[in-house]
């Protein structure tokens, strides 16, 4: 008698192909893999290009046209699905860091057979900026997809000679990741050229990178990046994603170059990807211990950076003293011991990117952060739904809707706000919070994470719009409070105001006393950047380009200090 498993397999085989294609949309990639293992006959039905194309669609990170375009540079839709599920989907979104206070927003989006991180630069924009799609940005990192669906990491940055790429390893990406960490990672050397290299496993008592003193971590990153750096010309540095300027052939050529760089380092021009892996020297790794014999232990001493340590580091590595003279011997010995333990954990060292999940606390949608770790934090930006119609990412400027305000300056500071819904702790009512994540001024009074306004979404406002709005229909208006005097992002003052809803994609908040207006439009940064009409700002040096560690209230993301786009 036929068992149940065999009967189920036979039943699937009798289904018409189009019917099974519909059913497959309700299956996950892991379900498909399990079906492949169920019997000898099922793989022919399930493990097909058509079936994996459906799975690529169901990941819902790329439109069908781009999925088909990406297939050109990869072995199969199955390999592509692996990259979309394991790399692209978990990383997409907005990542932030508190420092510098003016704005550190990294937007992660699909590239071309890659996922790319682009920093949105604090800037000034014209009133029609969203229609013209002109946004300044700078490259931060990218993860490229190999022919077999594998991945390779590049950090962007620059040195005195120009823009550079810094190849490294993807150490792991959790599906629900909310912390992105840049590390120096220990590696074990290959015993032979054909052996697969793996990261060094941590034994009990070994010190992880994040437990080192801040200055040690910074110096190790500087050592590694300076030795793996690969200089690139600006067009290669800018073509991170498809735009109107770059055709598919140019993107394919760029990806081929990146794959060569990741595999062969500085010798990539003379190598072919098809060549056998007989290169014993790994261009992504540095033998730090050999270098340190010549540098000496004083290389890691940085008196200025001893001040910048977190409370966690104080208890494990450093004291709170502000100079080396006040550092107790025991604390200094612990610091040296930790560093030596870390350096002994691998034969070579390279750059590593890890995306992990961590339990976090939030204040009005803004995560509490470690300021002196090389970390980016994912913002929980929600999509608009029926009961939360205004949730999501918004951008705007101080000023009335187009045509409603007196003529003034042609360019104004760009604000990016995350709108989220919460339950008010005081009155148990729903509120809409507009959290500022970027401000385009040269100097900022209130830092990242500041609530620009808090609106009682169930309380209508009877206040009039401050200028003639005869031609503008307001769907709704709600009472609330907007930021006033105060300091930090937790202790801001507030004054009464109202939120006016022009459409579901156009809002205006008005401070009642001053009549100041901030007009916001719903944003799709992917669409804006892919128009290619904005400008690419050169990146910072590598470690600063990932996370800028110093507290600063001025714009650190451009060297063009005379650029009017960054003035008050």
Curated annotation (Swiss-Prot):
InterPro entries: At5g39450-like, F-box-like_dom_sf, F-box_dom. Residues 321-332 have a biased composition (Low complexity). Residues 315-337 are annotated as: Disordered. Residues 9-55 form the F-box domain. One of its GO terms (cellular component) is plastid. This is Putative F-box protein At5g39480. It comes from Arabidopsis thaliana.
């Amino acid at each position: 008698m036929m068992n149940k498993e065999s009967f189920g397999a036979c039943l699937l085989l009798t289904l018409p192909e189009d019917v099974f294609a519909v059913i497959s949309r309700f299956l996950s990639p892991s379900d498909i893999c399990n079906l492949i293992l169920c019997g000898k006959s099922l793989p022919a039905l399930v493990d097909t290009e058509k079936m994996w194309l459906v799975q690529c669609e169901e990941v819902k990170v790329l439109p069908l046209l781009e999925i088909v375009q990406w297939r050109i540079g990869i072995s199969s839709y199955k390999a592509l699905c692996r990259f979309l599920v394991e790399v692209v989907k978990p990383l997409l979104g907005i990542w932030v860091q508190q420092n510098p206070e003016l704005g550190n927003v990294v937007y992660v989006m699909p590239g071309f057979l890659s996922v790319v991180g682009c920093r949105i630069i604090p800037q000034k924009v014209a009133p029609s900026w969203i229609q013209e799609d002109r946004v300044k940005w700078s490259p931060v990192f990218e993860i490229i997809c190999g022919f077999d669906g594998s991945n390779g990491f590049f950090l962007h940055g620059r040195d005195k000679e120009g823009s550079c790429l810094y190849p490294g390893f993807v150490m792991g990406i959790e599906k629900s990741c909310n912390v992105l960490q840049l590390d120096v990672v220990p590696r074990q050397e290959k015993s032979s050229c054909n052996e697969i290299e793996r990261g060094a496993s941590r034994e009990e008592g070994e010190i992880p990178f994040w437990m080192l003193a801040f200055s040690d971590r910074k110096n190790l990153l500087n050592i590694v990046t300076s030795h793996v750096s690969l200089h690139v010309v600006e067009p290669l540095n800018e073509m991170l994603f498809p735009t109107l300027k770059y055709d598919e052939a140019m993107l394919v050529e760029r990806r081929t170059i990146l794959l060569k760089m990741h595999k062969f380092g500085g010798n990539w021009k003379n190598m072919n990807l098809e060549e056998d892996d007989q290169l014993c020297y790994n261009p992504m790794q540095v033998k730090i211990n050999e270098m340190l014999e010549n540098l000496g232990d004083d290389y890691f001493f940085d008196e200025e950076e001893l001040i910048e340590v977190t409370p966690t580091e104080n208890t494990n590595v450093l004291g709170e003293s502000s100079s080396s003279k006040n550092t107790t011997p025991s604390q200094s010995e612990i610091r040296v011991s930790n560093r030596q333990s870390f350096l002994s954990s691998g034969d070579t060292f390279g750059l590593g990117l890890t995306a992990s999940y961590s339990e976090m606390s939030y204040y009005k949608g803004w995560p509490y952060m470690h300021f002196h770790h090389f970390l980016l934090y994912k913002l929980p930006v929600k999509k608009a739904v029926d009961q939360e119609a205004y949730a999501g990412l918004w951008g705007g400027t101080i000023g009335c809707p187009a045509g409603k305000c007196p003529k003034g300056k042609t360019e104004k500071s760009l604000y990016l706000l995350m709108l989220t819904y919460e339950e008010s702790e005081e009155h148990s009512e729903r509120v809409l919070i507009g959290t500022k994540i970027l401000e385009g001024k040269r100097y900022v009074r209130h830092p990242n994470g500041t609530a620009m306004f808090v609106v009682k979404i169930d309380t209508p406002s009877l206040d009039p719009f401050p200028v003639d709005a005869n031609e503008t229909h307001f769907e709704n208006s709600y009472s609330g409070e907007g930021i006033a005097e105060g300091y930090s992002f937790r202790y801001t003052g507030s004054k009464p105001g109202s939120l006016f809803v022009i459409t579901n994609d156009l809002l205006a908040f008005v401070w009642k006393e001053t009549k100041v207006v901030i007009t916001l439009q719903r944003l799709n940064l992917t669409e804006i950047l892919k128009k290619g009409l904005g400008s690419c700002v050169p990146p910072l040096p590598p470690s600063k380009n990932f996370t800028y560690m110093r507290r600063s209230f001025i714009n650190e993301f451009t060297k063009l200090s005379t650029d009017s786009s960054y003035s008050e």
